[in-house]
A protein has these predicted regions:
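Active-site activation/catalytic loop segments of kinase-like enzymes and analogous catalytic loops
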Residues: 241-276, 291-308
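A cross-family kinase active-site recognition segment
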Residues: 110-183, 207
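A glycine-centered beta->alpha junction motif in the catalytic cores
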Residues: 96-110, 164-175, 247, 291-311
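Protein kinase glycine-rich loop
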Residues: 22-27
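ATP/Mg2+ or Mg2+-diphosphate-binding catalytic cores
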Residues: 160, 164, 168, 273, ...
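ATP-binding pocket architecture of kinase catalytic cores
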Residues: 38-141
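Juxta-kinase regulatory segment immediately upstream of eukaryotic protein kinase catalytic domains
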Residues: 1-21
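Active-site acidic catalytic loop and adjacent metal/ATP-binding pocket
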Residues: 29-38, 44-45, 79, 191-242
Length: 338
């Protein structure tokens, strides 16, 4: 097994028995996870591999937050403490955490009814409301670092990035269908940005504590009920309504790059009610996330700059969405605010 964790040392520290099976869980892009069965039970073993989030003290702070959320009834899977009373084990310079195994499956928006979509929005709204209760006041906290900065993208920087990516596409040999689609979308996006550059949003508004990475692979369902929100590595202070919009876009995008707007509407109504978020906050967030998508090329950067193709399968729908959203801007905004 590649990148095999030090099971003997970890299981002794946790008093979790002897390993029977240990299988990689392959959905994560930034960390490594394992389904671990031992003589004492079933667990999820997480190797905190991403250097941006792997500091043991920071991991333990997030662990304490999830335990407080669990105490408020939020469906999470707090980690287990080991024999030294901590929830992070550092072995060989690497940080690990052991969680109870949660039986469940991931579900995308196409598998949810409108009622279940509303329940999803209410869940995220409750998460935001509960985080305000269990986390320190925002005024004493620096905004989280990560892929969603408060300052909106500068189109001048995006034009330069498009030119650089087009250079990568031209140099890739042999050219393939992905290169052809990438070139088409880059040229298309450049034209859209030239047309809409004056619509760049101002700096973000109201911030709050957010999960930071709320999407289908970080939510487990048992039957029709959310069983656990996982992967709190990006917990931090960000514009909270932007997380709500961003999550809706990920959950409810269709394979052709359109959004299921009736489900978005049900989700957004429930979110606003649970989080106490006004419609104006959602409207501003929708505009900022639209602009973010118009300027975002992380999947192409992974492909061409890192040689990492794990996100390639997401690119056709994600790249088509930016174009469709621009064309249907008013309808999308209306779905988030009414």
């Amino acid at each position: 097994m590649p990148h095999a964790p030090p099971l003997g040392a970890l299981l002794r520290l946790y008093g979790a028995g002897t390993a029977v099976t240990c299988e990689p869980v392959d959905q994560g892009l930034l960390n490594r996870g394992y389904r671990l069965c031992t003589t004492r039970g079933r667990y999820f073993l997480k190797h905190h591999f991403d250097p941006d989030t792997a500091d043991p003290a920071a991991i333990e702070r997030r662990h304490r937050a999830t335990q407080r959320l669990a105490d408020l009834g939020v469906p999470v899977a707090p980690p287990l403490a080991h024999r030294e009373g901590r929830t992070v084990a550092v072995v060989g310079g690497h940080a690990y955490a052991l969680h109870p195994w949660i039986d469940g499956r991931h579900r995308h928006g196409g598998q949810l009814t409108r009622g279940q979509s509303a329940r999803l929005g209410a869940l995220l709204g409750a998460v935001h409301a509960c985080l305000e209760r269990v986390m320190p006041p925002k005024v004493h906290t620096r905004p989280a670092t990560g892929p969603h900065p408060v300052r909106s993208a500068d189109p001048a920087d995006t034009f330069a990035l498009i030119d650089a990516l087009l250079g990568h596409v031209r140099r890739h040999r042999p050219a393939d269908a992905f290169d052809e689609l990438a070139r088409h979308r880059l040229l298309e996006r450049r034209a859209l940005l030239e047309q809409h550059a004056a619509r760049r949003p101002p700096r973000g508004g109201s911030v709050g504590w957010v999960h930071g990475d709320f999407h289908p692979f970080n939510l487990l369902y048992k039957d029709d009920t959310p069983a656990a929100i996982v992967d709190w590595d990006r917990l931090g202070v960000q514009p909270r309504a932007e997380e709500a919009v961003r999550a809706a876009v990920i959950f409810f995008v269709r394979p052709g790059g359109t959004l299921d707007l009736p489900k978005v509407r049900a989700y957004a109504r429930a979110y606003r009610r649970a989080a106490g978020a006004p419609s104006a906050e959602l409207a501003a967030a929708a505009h900022r996330v639209w602009w973010e998508r118009l300027n975002d090329f992380w999947m192409l950067r992974w492909h061409y700059e890192r040689g990492d193709t794990r996100a390639d399968c997401q690119f056709p729908a994600a790249s088509a969405l930016a174009v469709w959203w621009t064309r249907e801007y008013d309808a999308v905004c209306d779905a988030f605010v009414r």
